[in-house]
Swiss-Prot record:
Keywords: 2Fe-2S, 4Fe-4S, Biotin biosynthesis, Iron, Iron-sulfur, Metal-binding, S-adenosyl-L-methionine, Transferase. The keyword Transferase applies. This is Biotin synthase. Catalyzes the conversion of dethiobiotin (DTB) to biotin by the insertion of a sulfur atom into dethiobiotin via a radical-based mechanism. [4Fe-4S] cluster binds at C55, C59, C62. PANTHER family: BIOTIN SYNTHASE, BIOTIN SYNTHASE, MITOCHONDRIAL. The gene is bioB. One of its GO terms (biological process) is biotin biosynthetic process. SUPFAM superfamilies: Radical SAM enzymes. The keyword Metal-binding applies. Pfam families: BATS, Radical_SAM. PROSITE patterns: RADICAL_SAM. Belongs to the radical SAM superfamily. Biotin synthase family.
Amino acid sequence: MTLSIRHDWTTEEIQTLLELPLMELLWEAQTVHRKANPGYRVQLASLLSVKTGGCEEDCAYCSQSIHNSSDVTAFEAQMQVEPVLQRARAAKEAGADRFCMGWAWREIRDGAPFEAMLEMVRGVRGMGMEACVTAGMLTDQQAERLAEAGLTAYNHNLDTSPEHYDRIISTRTYQERLETLERVRKAGVTLCCGGIIGMGETLRDRASMLQVLASMNPHPESVPVNGLVAVEGTPLEDQAPFEPLELVRMVATARILMPHARVRLSAGRESMSREAQILCLQAGADSIFYGDVLLTTGNPDVEADRQLLSDAGVTANWQEETAAPVNCSPR
């Protein structure tokens, strides 16, 4: 059955979805999810911090900002290419088929670190894995070079709604985020774009953020749904923990709005019970970050995730055949 894809959702419509009785919301999300994802497969993605700390941005949630005082804000040198590729091989052997690499940068700058990034992307793609990069803002030319290297997706999150955004970050505008996403899309690289709940936003803010995502045409290929991990030394260190069922609601609503996007269960999962995580899978999450660290915060370990997926009765890509390598040699 063909799903109706919309790009004209209003914030009011989305808030109405978020406010539905939970069982009704789950039923609607399940109906969409089973049509869009009949095999009910969950993609396993691994995430590595290639360059940690020293970021010039002042994101209130982030342990890597020079404006905050967590234990990881100091500058660390970028990892070399081969150790990164070794981690990618290990991730593949553990079952991941998408390898995401993070740089704590405000923006990509031309030079040796960017050339190394391109080599990493080519190496990951040569293993038959999807490659995703998150490294801040970039130019048209940089986006084109990443596309030529074979980059599958570029992650650049909205974080929150346009209305709540200034309470979370002041060093980059919302419009700059949207312009970065447009450059990535223009280069032919798919978008990985989502946000975070639990940062003091209202339900209306959550609906507004989802409205921005659902208005994109096409929808993002991947939509990470994060719950705040309150890190000591950041402005949000004393923020009350998010309610797990609120994250379930965000997953379900994202699935209804963007039927074919990968809704990725991301940061904050470590604080959720197995039952809440299974509800997220039922609600439409079809990807998880896999491994015990997400950049600088914790995540359930590999064996726990395998058991979780097995108990939930969903098929993960680690049970499938290995993908063929992709030749992404420099032109």
